[in-house]
């Protein structure tokens, strides 16, 4: 994917002036960043966007903070195992395009091949019992052996054991984060996150530097389910 397209999406999400579901709706209707950017301003006015939003959508925003953050993300993506996957990219998961609010761009750290596998979502409580965590670990191993890639949220409890079950069976796993790609939460999962980078991928839709705001976690769940052909919520007991 060319850097101009990535830069366009990065400026949009960094500005926080246009909700991601609205960006997604535009992409579903017009097909690409290029098609959206080339629409006449009057079309955006008819759709109810204000002047600042129209400037962003037309690619003419001059907001320095947004531009600087976007440039830092491009620099991040120039390093080994770091990727920016835009909506138009061949590496963008096809199932994720089908949801109403698919992210316009994904930050990926690890293996791109893991994005296009057959995923199964395995999630649950952070405050799970030993029994619940044991079940999550076992189910992750069995599903992995059956050819499915476990997708979860890197949280404590069930999510962590699901990732560990997949990794310990020698298979890849995908972790969808509720922070920027450059910040692991909880911090106690840094070693697990590194294992996932080496045998799967960390994924985030959020701008770099985004802290673990509580609202981020329900929001990222749509990506976990959107990536998967099926899902299972493991009870904490």
Show the residue positions of the predicted features.
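Short, small/acidic-rich helices and loops at N termini and domain boundaries
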Residues: 1-88
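Glycine-biased, small-residue-rich flexible motifs in mid-sequence functional cores and linkers
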Residues: 1-5, 84-237
């Amino acid at each position: 994917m060319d850097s101009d397209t990535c830069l366009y999406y990065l400026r949009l999400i960094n500005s926080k002036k246009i909700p991601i579901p609205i960006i997604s709706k535009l992409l579903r209707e017009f097909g690409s960043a290029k098609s959206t950017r080339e629409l006449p301003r009057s079309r955006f006015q008819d759709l109810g966007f204000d002047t600042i939003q129209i400037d962003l959508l037309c690619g003419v925003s001059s907001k320095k903070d947004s531009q600087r953050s976007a440039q830092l993300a491009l620099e991040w993506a120039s390093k080994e195992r770091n990727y920016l996957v835009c909506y138009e990219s061949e590496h963008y998961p096809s199932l994720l395009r089908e949801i109403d609010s698919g992210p316009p761009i994904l930050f990926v750290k690890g293996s791109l091949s893991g994005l296009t596998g057959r995923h199964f979502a395995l999630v649950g409580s952070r405050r799970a019992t030993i029994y619940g965590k044991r079940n999550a670990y076992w189910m992750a191993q069995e599903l992995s052996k059956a050819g499915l890639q476990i997708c979860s949220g890197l949280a404590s409890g069930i999510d962590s054991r699901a990732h560990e079950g997949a990794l310990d069976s020698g298979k890849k796993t995908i972790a969808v984060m509720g922070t920027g790609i450059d910040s692991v939460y909880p911090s106690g999962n840094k070693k697990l996150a590194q294992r996932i980078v080496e045998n799967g991928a960390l994924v985030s839709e959020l701008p770099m530097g985004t802290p673990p705001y509580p609202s981020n976690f329900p929001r990222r769940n749509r990506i976990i389910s959107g990536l998967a052909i099926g899902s299972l919520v493991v009870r904490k007991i």
